[in-house]
Structure formats: structure tokens, C-alpha cells
Amino acid sequence: MKLIINADDFGFTRAINYGIIDAHNLGVLTSTTLMVTMPAFEHAVDLSKKTPTLGIGLHLNLTLGKPLTNGATLVNEDGELIKPKFTTPEYPYNEEEVYQEFKAQYHRFTEFMKKKPSHLDSHLFSTDIYPVVTSAAKRLAEEIGIPLRNHDTKGFEHVEFMWEKPLEIPYGEYDNLDYIYDNAASILCYDYVEIMTHPGYLDTFILENSTFSTPRANELESLISPRMRQFLNENNVELISYHDIPKK
């Protein structure tokens, strides 16, 4: 089978960036998605240019930090993007404002990276949770000809998306990637699979702005561990990125 191991949150912080690069250079990570609105975005761009074998997509962000556009329905009274804990799936986002924000993020990606992203996905599953956001993201994906990876739109129809929830693992049962070994049969039965990860080193910004902190360091250790490499070799797993996937 062919496996994409993708890291979300490239550009979140310098510590996260270094962790993602180490997970690729020292381990089995093949792909990442870049957040263009976060403080360490340009640092991530610089690192990526020294790491041409790492596939890089765009991590559409509607839930953290400041937007690139002025959409009134996207922000709180402080001008910050609205965090999911203050919304519901029916939150009244304006679809055109969401589309324009995502389009601006795409253009910032291409301006700095000098290429198109390998694929689109979203921070905190916003393109899965909010129907209006899903519609705006699909519109952008169709316009630029780059598939959106989410649970329903099947932008990459060949790829099964794996993490704890689809495998029906109780939240918090694992704080590393050992669920891969424990659920190998449910993962290895497909031809193409993406495993979502969040590797990284920790810093103050992450500890103050992310509910997912210590497990990032644990996932990094898993990705660079001899055990993971041995597991993939023993099961004849071919590591690929989204550049290697047939498009619809």
C-alpha cells in the first residue's frame, strides 16, 4: 500500500517548523500543510526551500490569529478569527467572505512558495464542520484545480483519511502514534492512506494557543523512531506525498 504521512500546522511556530522538518529528514514524514497567517510562516517557507523532498499543501485557517482580509463575519471584536469553541456548525459565516479569505491565503502561499500547494486541507477541520466553509473551500479548489482533502468532498477519491476518530479510538487514549501499530489491519487494507499527524517541538506560543501540546513532541518521537521505520518496511509500505496521487 501507499502511505502519505502528513503534518498539519507548518508555520504555526518556529518550534513546530523545526519538528516537522526533523520528522521528514530523520523520520518517515512525507507531507505537510502550511499555515500562511501564522507568525512563523516565512520561517517555514525558508526551511521548505532547503527541503525539496517534502510535499507541501495549504492548511486553510479560519479559526486562529488574524485574517488576511476584512470579512466582518470571520472575526471577533478584537479582529481575531473566531475560535471553534465560540461557534456551532450553523454559525453565520458569510460564504463570500470565507471564499475571499481562503483565496487570499492561497495567493500568499504561491507568492512566497513560488509554486502551487500539493493539496488543500483545513485547520481544526473547519471545512468539515461548517457547511458554508465547505462550500467556499470547494469553490476555491475547483477554481485553482487543486483537490481539497476533507471527509466528505473526496477531493482525493483514492485516499483513505486515517486518524484516531475514524478508527473509533476514544479521544485521549493515545498521546503518540502507537494507534498505528494497534490498528494496523484497519489501515493497511487500503491502497492509499493519509495519516494525519501534528509533530513538533514545544514553545510558549504553542503552550498558550493550542490545546494539543505535549502529544506533538510524542508524535515527533514516533515518526523518527526505528520502530516506525521497521513497521513500514515489514508491511511493504511505500511512502509518498500528495504529488504522487492521481487527481480526479
From Swiss-Prot:
GO terms for biological process: polysaccharide catabolic process. Its cofactor is Mg(2+). Pfam families: YdjC. Its EC number is 3.5.1.-. InterPro entries: COD_ChbG_bac, Glyco_hydro/deAcase_b/a-brl, YdjC-like. GO terms for molecular function: deacetylase activity; hydrolase activity, acting on carbon-nitrogen (but not peptide) bonds, in linear amides; metal ion binding. Mg(2+) binds at residues 59, 123. Keywords: Carbohydrate metabolism, Hydrolase, Magnesium, Metal-binding. It comes from the Bacteria. HAMAP family: COD. Probably catalyzes the deacetylation of acetylated carbohydrates an important step in the degradation of oligosaccharides. Homodimer. Belongs to the YdjC deacetylase family. This is Carbohydrate deacetylase 2.
